[in-house]
Amino acid sequence: VLATTSFLEDIAQNIAPSSCTIQTIVPRGMDPHIYEPTPSDVELVNQSDLILMNGLRLEVWIDNLIDHSGKHGKKVVVSKGVNPIENESYENAPDPHAWMDLQLGKIYAQNTKQALVELIPEQKEEIEARYQEYIQEMDSLHQWALTSILEIPEENRVLITSHDAFQYFGKAYGLELHSVLGLSTDADVQTGDVLKISQLLQSRSIPAIFVESTINPKLLQQIAHDHNVSIGGQLYADALSNKEGPAPSYLSLFRHNISTIKRGLSAESSTSTSSAPDGVKWLSYGLIFAIMASLFITSYRKLS
């Protein structure tokens, strides 16, 4: 069984019987939005009996990879049944990050279970038992997440991150969401988005903002520095950490993120609602724009 991402691989490993081999295309720590398949990935596809993918335009490279492999085995979109959040800025661009709500993650698990039962029906009983145990863990973790977020002061329940991967998360657990980048990490940084974040931090006492594991943290670090706001920690969304890291599994990703967010947003804010002197403010914007230009040039060179 071949999963496109590390979190889908982990979900499958928790449900599949021990006799089933689960592998992933996008390695741990790597961004599936901008992943570039390798020749070894073609071989993985050729060896697979089943491919589990997120869908919702997360893996825009998958069809081309399958075409290159020449093998057209069974492909299952595990987000099937999710009512996606639509992107207001672009048509036909649903938010793919539905796994960031554990209740929707149960749909992923159910679709994975069904695909495994169809692949190896003789092991249906074991698959069903493992699935039920996993669902119970997800339900328990979901309730803990709800309780934990409620312990954050209400005025602090504002989550500012690198890219827009936490809309399902915020909707499920009661957080107001803002980000510098859009739904995909290959989007360009927009000046207006940076200014909105800066204005938000000037007008409200938000104690922390958060970087993400698969995205260059420089821009958010500069914004935090300019507004005397803490970096609350590193969150995981599009990929799991390595096995020795803080988010080696889908469920531990949630435990880590909730704990990190609660700790960061429960702290006393060191920001002041008064504006910085104009000279300092414009110097800050200049530094931010310089970082944006550097990131754009790096991306352009990579594409070239």
Predicted segments, located by residue:
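Extracytoplasmic metal-acquisition and chelation regions
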Residues: V1-S304
